[in-house]
A protein has these predicted regions:
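A short helix-loop-beta-strand connector motif used in the catalytic cores of GNAT acetyltransferases and
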Residues: 53-65
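Acyl-donor (CoA/ACP) binding surface of acyl/acetyltransferases
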Residues: 1-33, 50, 67-166
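Short amphipathic alpha-helix in the helical subdomain of ABC transporter nucleotide-binding domains
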Residues: 41-45
Length: 166
């Protein structure tokens, strides 16, 4: 999978991405709204990459790398994860990339790819209520708030996107 947006190159995770990915995953600001907020160590970062590599093979989707088109630096991820609640949509960016509209740019491109190329119809997203930037992105993409859910003792807003608007 090689997808491009105006400022991003979007592709599959590879084991060679470990050092760049670890720099993102060890930042407490980036991890603040993810599960318990714990940063990942290098071993956990590699496990995350391997989980996505396995997901590409098994489901034909996963979380994808986001690279800056100019520098080719790995700056985040965006994509899909098969979960008990359905196909989950998620994204995150390196803190130095916040505030430039890259979250929406990536999410818009990857969501369109998921619908048009992979054929996904119903997609869920869980977001902590205080993560206003992510809520704004989801709502701008057309995700609709469904309910609040408790996961690992934290409250999340559950959003749903359906490509079948009937």
């Amino acid at each position: 999978m090689n997808l491009k947006s105006d400022r991003l190159l979007i592709g599959h995770f590879k084991r060679a991405d470990l050092q760049e990915w670890f720099l993102i995953e060890r930042d407490p600001s980036v991890r603040k709204y993810i599960l318990d907020g714990s940063v990942l160590n290098e071993e956990q970062s590699l496990a995350y990459i391997e989980q996505n590599i396995a997901s590409y093979a098994k489901f034909n989707f996963g979380r994808y790398t986001l690279r800056d088109k100019k520098s080719l630096r790995l700056i985040g991820m965006c994509g899909f994860l098969n979960t008990d609640m359905g196909i989950d949509f998620g994204y995150r960016l390196s803190k130095d990339m916040w505030g430039y509209g890259l979250g929406f740019e990536a999410a818009n491109a990857v969501l369109a790819y998921g619908i048009k190329v992979i054929g996904l119809n119903h997609i869920v997203a869980g977001v902590m209520p205080e993560n206003l930037a992510s809520i704004k992105i989801l709502e701008r993409l057309g995700f609709i708030y469904q309910t609040d859910v408790i996961y690992e003792r934290k409250t999340y807003h559950k959003y749903m996107f359906s490509s079948n608007k009937n």
